[in-house]
């Protein structure tokens, strides 16, 4: 950690008031703050500094020497720098909007924090030196540069009665200690850290007091409104204590945590006193303004969700004005990830479809009758669950099952296209889940093979290989050092099982396509997360097949808890819920950062499931974070799936969904936009949660973005020759409104001045233009309609999907 503090003096000339060893001066004018915001992708340069909490006041005399603690939390303070004279207008104003970003600086650490830190360091040292991982048979070295040899993560393993509502008797650690983010190299920040104001490249105003709101997170910027309110209120409290000479009273949990001499009115000038009082009042007024906008029926995280959507709309509007391809990428991202309400004209069904839709909906479509159990016995089960002539080569590949970037396509080749069965079986063995939950190995293999058979081999992206990739990615994320011993075995089982079933029976089209075509599934699930609901129904229904109930030995309470968790996790893979999910996680992380403890307790179901939901969501959106060779293969597959949907839409006379028209789609630009506006903000937030364990993942993500950026053609793509095919590109540029309605319908955003119909299907589903799209697209109707258009195949049941047809038998 010494290296992290060495860069503290580097900010002397950054335009911000420099800090002395004992105090701080007023900040420079707003136009000098975070000058790097003028770059399209600002560079984040957090610093480790110690500031006096009452930074408006002159620094106190240096304290008497204190004995060094056995396990210090911070490096020695940097040498004092002469503060520059405050320029005119340097007085800081309160937040002008909820888009203001607050800077949180170090103040010191309490005895409790030092104890927790030292305790965690002891456990971390043991884990690093021995490779020990509770619940895992092998040492996990999945984080080579972020984990090995470093002692910078911390998980408190103290007991907490009833901490997990799912399994209070076996719930492990009591929380996750959020670490300060010291970036080893300059990295781009996501658009979330830009100004939340139109045509203003620098933050409107950083709360003058938010910079002292946290003891642990030195220069971390806070961008979620609720966390900013908390930071400001903590500053108001500290200033009030200074103004009223109340800081000598018994300290509370909200008191400044560093030992500082008492400050009373006599120690400062009357001018400084009045200035501090005025700024405190302004800060309090800003907090009141923010709280007055809250609505009782909405959560505080919706403040962040509305803000992020407003900022994304502004970014997409700018992108759409640059070129036709930029307009298409903007429309795709908006339709897919902003959960818009679509007004569409539903086409009339064909006669054949009418006949099929007369059948009852009492059965779950897509479930096939398969017999895998008859040939399986405990003595005949192969080493990896499937028979293969290349078992030794497969074993070599599976040695990387605990590492980020497993070559899942190679696993599929070596296993006879059974990657899901092989990887799930290996992970269950690694984590000893078979023994923990008394799962018969033949039952596990039977279920896995049955589940894998219900993924469609003719779907380019949403198939069994994608499911295996998400399972393995979730497995690695669960093993991240920061989350060690945080989740129970039942929660781990739920996350892995949810990853395995999250796209089962996916037909290769989006949710919106199913809605637009008036599919049976859309009717059954009321147009709400159509595919995600179907994936859950099929995944649980298959447990009822012969010798497939892998949860047969769980208690009733365990089964109920697991089912609830799996449902919550899979429904969260609906890409239209992305911004809400991101806002919830970022609000939770930043709220804990600005509190005195900085500890994320995860002591209730809501917080714990939120982390698991985001974990699987990250795994589902992990393609751009994998090695470029794998990422490019996934990109080719998702684009092939998109183009197939576009061809079906063209045949039906429907408007072609964004990024689904093979004649004018910009693949490279779509990947860059997808990373900038969706993947990077998500992984950036996850990296904050588990810092520093995901730094290598962010590095790979940035490298991949730069590669795709370098491949974008310099000249604009020519207009298509066929006016029929190019009609979508000839429409007006897609525009996005810059403000959201305050009536609570935060997810509903109307397009201003644009004729673009958002009914296009490619959007609302998990169709990530670049990488793994999520379980949002299921083209039931499409396949049905395709059948009607094709030759007479009524006698052939399609194992393919959930359609209005009867299940295969």
Swiss-Prot record:
Reactions catalysed: 3',5'-cyclic AMP + H2O = AMP + H(+)
Q: Where does Mg(2+) bind?
A: 503
Q: Where does 3',5'-cyclic AMP bind?
A: 462, 671, 674
**Residues involved in Mn(2+) binding:** 503
Q: What is its main location?
A: membrane
Q: Which GO terms describe its molecular function?
A: 3',5'-cyclic-AMP phosphodiesterase activity; 3',5'-cyclic-GMP phosphodiesterase activity; 3',5'-cyclic-nucleotide phosphodiesterase activity; ATPase binding; beta-2 adrenergic receptor binding; calcium channel regulator activity; cAMP binding; enzyme binding
Instruction: For the region Disordered, give the residue spans.
Output: 1-107, 343-364, 710-729, 739-809
Cross-link Glycyl lysine isopeptide (Lys-Gly) (interchain with G-Cter in SUMO): which residues?
Answer: 387
Q: Which parts of the sequence carry Phosphoserine?
A: 142, 299, 301, 348, 375
Record note on quaternary structure? Homodimer for the long isoforms. Isoforms with truncated N-termini are monomeric. Isoform 3 is part of a ternary complex containing PRKAR2A, PRKAR2B and AKAP9. Interacts with PDE4DIP. Identified in a complex composed of RYR1, PDE4D, PKA, FKBP1A and protein phosphatase 1 (PP1). Isoform 5, isoform N3 and isoform 12 bind RACK1 via their unique N-terminus. Binds ARRB2. Interacts (via N-terminal region) with SHANK2 (via proline-rich region); the interaction is increased in a PKA-dependent manner.
State the disease linkage annotated in the record: Genetic variations in PDE4D might be associated with susceptibility to stroke. PubMed:17006457 states that association with stroke has to be considered with caution.
Name of protein: 3',5'-cyclic-AMP phosphodiesterase 4D
